[in-house]
């Protein structure tokens, strides 16, 4: 048994867990994990089996002191144990998330295309020394780093790519009293990765992306994984960050002033214009304006109860996304994957590393989906191209000479 103790430390370090992580997973103190690794105490049989699963090694290797490579870290189990209040209906989505990350790492090796994932945050945040305006200042800091200023964010997926954060979407359950809105995981091979609950409304999903970015950038030094469920200081910070990141106070007030809105809003059309400008949902905009004291509590409840935001936005000339009326899971068959993964999958087929059927089996997509990723028209369809007409318009107007 004496030879096992140094092996415990090496297996933990290879799996990129801290002693705090292991203690939290097994329900023991960090000091106890340290005693195990130092050899002053020994884990019991149940704890040893849990350590083997956690580190992704065979139990027999630990018992016999063999320094074997991990065979598969139980990341799904870690996510499920991170919040005991999460219902069992969320387990398949969490497992799908972890399995996707493993396939992503495998595909990177097959295609020789690196995953440019962040593994350590450049941002400093110490929760023990938090101030009231920390979330606002941190959101401003990240926006400044990305060159976003105080204006709207057109695409949160692009923001994740710029930060080196992998984003994946999977169904976790629609009842947020039992289901998480999302999760963060610092994956051993992929790096910072976030999961968004696909069962939520489009507006809530967008908010969750910003919320999980907060966990990745500001809580990853303390936690390797976070399940976004329930309340607490960490969740409160991530919520405040998300609101400020999507609708910065400075940007909202500047927009209101530039278009001639009063400092205290009472009209439903003003909320619609703010919502559409910042590309968030009506509930997100209304909640954010209430947080900023730009509307009173009475106005908030009145607009929440009486406004039909999609119909009103349409009457004001705004383009309406079909999902604003009804969610459509079919639209997310391909879009649930990060773009970098889709680029790799396409390269695997183009480079003849995989055939279309094998790429479909590998990714869980249909062959028709893979054909679509390749940029080819689907069989039996005639997809009109408007690009030739547009090129002719540039040439006819003299913007560029004809070839």
Language-model features, listed with the residues they occupy:
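Short juxta-domain linker segments that transition from a proline/glycine-rich
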Residues: 1-403
């Amino acid at each position: 048994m004496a030879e096992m103790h140094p092996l415990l430390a090496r297996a933990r370090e290879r799996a990129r867990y801290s002693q705090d992580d292991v203690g939290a997973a097994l329900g023991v103190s960090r000091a106890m994990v340290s005693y195990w690794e130092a050899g002053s105490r020994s884990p019991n049989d149940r704890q040893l089996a849990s350590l083997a699963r956690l580190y992704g090694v065979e139990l027999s290797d630990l018992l016999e002191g063999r320094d074997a490579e991990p065979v598969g870290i139980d990341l799904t189990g870690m996510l499920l144990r991170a919040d005991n209040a999460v219902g069992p209906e969320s387990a398949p989505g969490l497992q799908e998330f972890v399995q996707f990350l493993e396939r992503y790492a495998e595909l990177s090796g097959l295609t020789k295309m690196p995953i440019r994932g962040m593994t350590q945050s450049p941002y400093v945040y110490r929760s023990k020394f938090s101030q009231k305006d920390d979330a606002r200042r941190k959101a401003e800091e990240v926006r400044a780093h990305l060159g976003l200023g105080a204006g709207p964010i057109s695409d949160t997926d692009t923001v994740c790519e710029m930060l080196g954060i992998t984003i994946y979407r999977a169904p976790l359950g629609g009842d947020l009293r039992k289901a998480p809105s999302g999760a963060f995981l610092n994956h051993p091979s992929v790096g910072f990765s976030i999961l968004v609950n696909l069962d939520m409304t489009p507006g809530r999903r967008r908010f969750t992306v910003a919320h999980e970015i907060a966990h990745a950038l500001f809580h990853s030094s303390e936690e390797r994984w976070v399940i976004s469920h329930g309340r607490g200081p960490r969740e409160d910070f991530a919520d405040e960050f998300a609101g400020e990141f999507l609708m910065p106070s400075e940007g909202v007030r500047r927009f209101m002033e530039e278009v001639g809105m009063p400092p205290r809003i009472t009209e439903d059309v003003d909320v619609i214009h703010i919502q559409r400008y910042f590309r968030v949902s009506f509930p997100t905009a209304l909640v954010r304006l209430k947080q900023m004291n730009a509307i009173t509590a009475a106005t908030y409840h009145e607009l929440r109860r009486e406004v039909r935001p999609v119909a009103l936005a349409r009457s004001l000339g705004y383009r309406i996304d079909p999902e604003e009326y009804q969610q459509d899971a079919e639209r997310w068959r391909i879009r649930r994957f990060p773009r970098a993964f889709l680029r790799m999958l396409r390269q695997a087929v183009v480079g003849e590393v995989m055939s279309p059927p094998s790429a479909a089996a590998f990714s869980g997509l249909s062959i028709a989906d893979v054909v679509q990723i390749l940029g080819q028209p689907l069989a039996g369809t005639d997809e009109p191209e408007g690009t030739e007409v547009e090129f002719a318009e540039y040439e006819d107007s003299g913007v560029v000479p004809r070839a």
